[in-house]
């Protein structure tokens, strides 16, 4: 049994409103039943751990193996396919561990990682990420979404491997309809498998800036038909940024009614789209602010780090929130708090985490900032000073110190 008393805790912008929180057996409690250690935060800001809803650990950190020239989605898929031919379980594990090390020290305590499944890679990536899931459970909760990056119906053998991974415990089933000759057929088949295995769904969807040819309607229809509300997420959906206001709001209301959730991946989506424009290049991001206003559960996430989909990244969700706020011209305190929620509380809602937060009964996953307010964390891209998973300290960061003459 372990217990901790957190004193002089600040939960918002009011520096005078300091609180005391109690942690016992890895959860926040109203009072302690045993002696405890005390952590005096001296007025530092405490927030619940950040939640990464969409990342690819298996293909991270491979830029040195790729030749980038066009910077398009098609090139990214092709270059990754070529690099994937040399992936080993040890290699995937080592690169995934690099990202997890960064993510943990950036304050992430829960992560959904997508893992590619196809006849070329087989279950190599999946097995490596399962090992990471076990080895890093002390600091971060990993859930695995297996998906057919290379297509499903046009890639024989893929479905059998997906089913094998699901039977082995993969928590989520993903999709990538635009890689199949018949995107709608892939969507329908994945819904059938999701029902068979009782899994949530997470699609890569509508990933360009052409408003024509959207498949979002088929996802909405299947969600209604099969009663999968709250269990379906669509990522990217950059086509939404090309819709006029009235059309967008109609789609947003349909998403909200169906219970389909949306994840925006700002770094990747900005890097890969709009290259056909020399001037007046669009800011092709899913407009979360408008979707949220219509009742859609939304999140922001990293997607890729150090590969042809996104050649950069430090696994900071705060940086992604700041990037989205900047590009989307969101700057008021309320808007910045909403951006923060899309990497924390709303992300937890999207992943259906049952015990997220800072109230009694919630898991004691939290991070500490030297920032004047939660909104300032996003505005200033503040790095967390320390983090805890289930009441156990997982990292600390030394504060910079000026050396005046």
Per-region residue spans from a language model:
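C-terminal cap of metal-dependent C-N hydrolases
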Residues: 349, 360-405
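Active-site metal-binding motif and surrounding structural segment of the metallo-beta-lactamase
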Residues: 33-47
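Alpha-helical scaffold segments that flank or form the walls of functional sites
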Residues: 63-114, 120-135, 160-167
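N-terminal metal-binding scaffold of metallo-dependent hydrolase/deaminase domains
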Residues: 1-35, 374
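Di-metal (Zn2+ and/or Mg2+/Mn2+) metal-binding site signature of metallo-dependent hydrolases
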Residues: 44-66, 208-209
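His/Asp/Glu-enriched, well-ordered alpha-helical/loop segment
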Residues: 200, 221-232, 268, 272, ...
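Histidine/acidic residue-rich metal-binding segments in metalloenzymes
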Residues: 124-138, 154-261, 277-300, 356
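Active-site gating loops and adjacent loop-to-helix segments of metal-dependent hydrolytic enzymes
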Residues: 61-92, 164, 197, 215-233, ...
């Amino acid at each position: 049994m372990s217990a901790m008393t957190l004193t002089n805790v600040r939960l918002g912008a009011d520096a005078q409103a300091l609180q005391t929180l109690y942690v016992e057996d890895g959860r926040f409690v109203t009072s302690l039943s045993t002696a405890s250690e005390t952590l005096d935060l001296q007025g530092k800001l405490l927030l619940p751990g950040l939640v990464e809803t969409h990342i690819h650990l298996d293909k991270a950190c491979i830029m040195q193996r790729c030749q980038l020239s066009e910077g398009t989605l098609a090139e990214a898929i092709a270059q990754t396919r070529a690099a994937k031919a040399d992936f080993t379980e040890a290699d995937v594990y080592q690169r995934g561990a690099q990202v997890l090390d960064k993510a943990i020290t950036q304050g992430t305590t829960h992560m959904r990682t997508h893992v590619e499944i196809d006849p070329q890679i087989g279950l190599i990536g999946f097995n490596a990420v399962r090992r990471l899931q076990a080895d890093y459970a002390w600091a971060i909760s990993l859930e695995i979404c297996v998906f057919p990056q290379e297509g499903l119906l046009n890639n024989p053998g893929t479905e059998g491997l997906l089913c094998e991974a699901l039977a082995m415990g993969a928590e989520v089933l993903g999709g990538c309809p635009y890689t199949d000759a018949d995107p709608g057929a892939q969507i329908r088949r994945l819904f059938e498998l999701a029902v068979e295995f009782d899994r949530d769904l997470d699609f890569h969807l509508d990933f360009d800036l052409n408003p024509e040819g959207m498949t979002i309607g088929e996802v909405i229809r299947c969600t209604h038909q099969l009663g999968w509300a709250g269990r379906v997420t669509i990522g990217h959906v950059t086509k939404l940024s090309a819709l006029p206001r009235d059309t967008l709001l109609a789609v947003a209301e349909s998403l909200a009614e169906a219970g389909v959730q949306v994840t925006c991946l700002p770094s990747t989506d900005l890097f890969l789209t709009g290259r056909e424009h020399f001037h007046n290049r669009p800011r092709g991001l899913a407009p979360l602010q408008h979707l949220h206003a219509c009742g859609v559960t939304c999140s922001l996430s990293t997607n890729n780090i150090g590969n042809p989909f996104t050649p950069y990244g430090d696994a900071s969700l705060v940086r992604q929130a700041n990037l989205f706020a900047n590009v989307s011209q969101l700057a008021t305190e309320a808007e910045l708090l909403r951006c923060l929620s899309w990497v924390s509380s709303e992300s937890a809602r999207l992943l259906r985490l049952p015990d997220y937060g800072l109230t009694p009964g919630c898991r004691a996953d939290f991070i500490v900032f030297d920032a004047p307010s939660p909104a300032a964390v996003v505005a200033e891209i503040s790095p967390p000073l320390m983090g805890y998973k289930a009441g156990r300290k997982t990292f600390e960061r030394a504060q910079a110190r000026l050396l005046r003459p």
